């Protein structure tokens, strides 16, 4: 059985996330998805959606066989437990595949590292773009204590 690992924050799920996971699943039989812990996300603003809810959403996606939260201190610990054949990277993940491959070898892991291409030029295939769109279209009405009716948002 060929095991694939995909990783990410998966905040504000969008079609780009789904594309990444669908393409990852095509590379093997079993797809494991490691969802970043809230406190480990340092390369961008903290997630909007709490880690347990992001995990629940990712686990519900059709291509995903197993979803788990990442380790809080060692990002390689779940990889060592899963022992995947392939680790996929999203097109915008800041890992250098060659550097990751060397780090895996140092831990006696021989997974192939594959970068998945982008979903294309879609307007809302980025969590950052979704947040920007909400601010642009709803910003003035998003004040605490005002317009709490979901129909107004």
Curated annotation (Swiss-Prot):
ATP binds at residues 9-10, 14-17, 92, 119. The keyword Chloroplast does not apply. Pfam families: CTP_transf_like. It catalyses: FMN + ATP + H(+) = FAD + diphosphate. GO terms for molecular function: ATP binding; FMN adenylyltransferase activity. Its cofactor is a divalent metal cation. SUPFAM superfamilies: Nucleotidylyl transferase (SSF52374). Belongs to the archaeal FAD synthase family. Homodimer. HAMAP family: FAD_synth_arch (MF_02115). Catalyzes the transfer of the AMP portion of ATP to flavin mononucleotide (FMN) to produce flavin adenine dinucleotide (FAD) coenzyme. NCBIfam families: cyt_tran_rel. PANTHER family: FAD SYNTHASE. This is FAD synthase. The gene is ribL.
